[in-house]
């Protein structure tokens, strides 16, 4: 019997170097039954919702918008330096301790409210939805426009900063002329605290791609708007940037407008006419074909909130099942459903308004402020890392600082006596070498986060926290029983007759 086979000229060989094997943390990490609870203080922030105002040539406050990313960098204590009541928890010679996050609750204060944004010189020519006739453009058709931004609620939990994506101006292959549209490319950067999320106008570098400074609201017109790169973080082989996430977005278009100015990409026409429209006699040039929609986040409701409720991590989406390497955790959050802007009015001359004074608009100054209130609570589980050659090599390839912080290096004792200057930075001594002033470098020193120190806020008293009681109920455990209060019993005399008294004979 004969069979037809395809051309066998191609021969597939395995790669010359072995493929890197990515381990799952459950393969070399053992979980214990020891849990800790930690929580932050009440975290408050006040600022201007649109920009950083100047007062006497100084920045009086920061920009604070409900559509900004809040990136919390939570720093935990080193569990390898803990003093445990028993010595059989782990073997320091063959094992190391690490934290694993098992539960988290992100709480928001302040009432629900819709934030507004806008621009006093917004490029909105005319409504394009219900237009009776075309109007002629003028030199300046910008108007004052206000709108409510896209409604966003999301948070991402991981042990490294969250990855973001945005579109930015790219390098052109050929020299461009004035007025040509620049090429754009997708860039991936880390999301920092205070950066803007998408408000309905897209994720791009508005500072570089909006030369008119009138095509976006004030809070993003000079900013880089980012969006979390869920595709990249979901395919991360180590799974450190995103253990899990929760997201809720909502938006609809309220108005349809057209841009004023010259259209960069004209509607194509040919010798036989245009396939897109039929020309008319006596009609002027076509109106603008650059259309935009004004976003609106619509109704905010407490029925669709992802905050102020606990989340339990039974299985992470990546290979890292909640292990907080280097004793830190990053929480990236956005909540535009509490975006109310405070309007504060102050009299220009008098500290207090007189009762008999009449209202005059020029006598009052008006200010805008936005406030935020956060509170984070976590349940941490103590885990043991077995120091096998495979696990050490895997962690070293992922992040060598993990091994350095565990002090696993073998240092040979010096044979010769060494010199140590007391004041090495003094001008009377030699210039200090790099080894003399060696300081541990922060890998995220150029990034901006909201640092929260929790090194002294871990507790094993689990009865005092509602989050822990909910967690213990989920896993089928009970908290430590409290001693029963002392009870006092009283004899019930109801229904009993009083004893008769004997009469004495006189």
Curated annotation (Swiss-Prot):
Region (Disordered): 484-506
GO cellular component, one term: host cell nucleus
Entry's family note: Belongs to the papillomaviridae L1 protein family.
Gene: L1
Gene Ontology BP annotations: endocytosis involved in viral entry into host cell; virion attachment to host cell
One GO MF term attached to the UniProt entry: structural molecule activity
Assembly behavior: Self-assembles into homopentamers. The capsid has an icosahedral symmetry and consists of 72 capsomers, with each capsomer being a pentamer of L1. Interacts with the minor capsid protein L2; this interaction is necessary for viral genome encapsidation. Interacts with protein E2; this interaction enhances E2-dependent replication and transcription activation.
Descriptive protein name: Major capsid protein L1
Cited function: Forms an icosahedral capsid with a T=7 symmetry and a 50 nm diameter. The capsid is composed of 72 pentamers linked to each other by disulfide bonds and associated with L2 proteins. Binds to heparan sulfate proteoglycans on cell surface of basal layer keratinocytes to provide initial virion attachment. This binding mediates a conformational change in the virus capsid that facilitates efficient infection. The virion enters the host cell via endocytosis. During virus trafficking, L1 protein dissociates from the viral DNA and the genomic DNA is released to the host nucleus.
Compartments where found: Virion; Host nucleus
């Amino acid at each position: 019997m004969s069979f037809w086979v395809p051309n066998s000229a191609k021969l597939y060989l395995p790669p010359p170097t072995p493929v890197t094997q990515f381990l799952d943390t459950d393969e070399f990490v053992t979980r214990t039954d020891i849990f800790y609870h930690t929580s932050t203080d009440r975290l408050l922030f006040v600022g201007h919702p649109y920009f950083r105002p100047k007062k006497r040539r100084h920045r009086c406050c920061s920009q604070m918008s409900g559509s900004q990313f809040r990136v919390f960098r939570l720093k935990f204590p080193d569990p390898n330096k803990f003093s445990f009541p028993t010595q059989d928890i782990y073997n320091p010679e063959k094992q190391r301790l690490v934290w694993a996050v098992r539960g988290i609750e992100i709480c928001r204060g302040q009432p629900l409210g819709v934030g507004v944004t806008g621009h006093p010189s917004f490029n909105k020519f005319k409504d394009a939805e219900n237009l009776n006739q075309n109007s002629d453009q003028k030199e300046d058709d910008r108007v004052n426009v206000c709108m409510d931004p896209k409604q966003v609620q999301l948070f991402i939990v991981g042990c490294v900063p969250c990855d973001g994506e945005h579109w930015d101006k790219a390098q052109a292959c050929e020299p461009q002329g004035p007025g040509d549209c620049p090429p754009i490319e997708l860039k991936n950067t880390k999301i920092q605290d205070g950066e803007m999320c998408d408000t309905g106008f897209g994720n791009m570098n508005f500072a570089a791609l909006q030369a008119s400074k009138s095509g976006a609201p004030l809070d993003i017109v000079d900013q880089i708007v980012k969006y979390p790169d869920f595709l990249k973080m979901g395919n991360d082989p180590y799974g450190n940037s995103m253990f899990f996430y929760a997201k809720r977005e909502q938006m609809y278009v309220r108005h349809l407008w057209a841009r004023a100015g010259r259209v960069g990409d004209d509607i194509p026409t040919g010798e036989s006419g245009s396939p897109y429209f039929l020309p008319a006699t006596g009609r002027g040039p076509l109106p603008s074909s650059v259309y935009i929609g004004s976003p609106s986040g619509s109704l905010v409701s407490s029925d669709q909130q992802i905050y102020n409720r606990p989340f339990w991590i039974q299985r992470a989406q990546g290979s890292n099942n909640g292990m907080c390497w280097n004793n830190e955790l990053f929480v990236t959050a956005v909540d535009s459903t509490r975006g109310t802007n405070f309007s504060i009015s102050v009299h220009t001359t008098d500290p207090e308004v007189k009762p008999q004074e009449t209202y005059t608009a020029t006598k009052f100054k008006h200010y805008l402020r936005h406030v935020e209130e956060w509170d984070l609570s976590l349940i941490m589980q103590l885990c043991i890392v077995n120091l096998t050659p495979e696990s050490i090599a895997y962690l070293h390839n992922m992040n060598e600082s993990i091994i350095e912080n565990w002090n696993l290096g073998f240092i040979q004792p010096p044979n010769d006596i060494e010199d140590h200057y007391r004041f090495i930075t003094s001008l009377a001594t030699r210039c200090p070498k790099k080894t003399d002033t060696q300081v541990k470098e922060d890998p995220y020193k150029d990034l901006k986060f909201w640092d929260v120190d929790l090194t002294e806020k871990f507790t094993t008293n689990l009865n005092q926290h509602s989050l822990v009681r909910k967690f213990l109920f989920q896993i089928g455990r009970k908290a430590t029983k409290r001693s029963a209060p002392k009870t006092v019993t009283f004899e019930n005399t109801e229904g009993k007759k009083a004893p008769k008294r004997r009469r004495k004979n006189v």
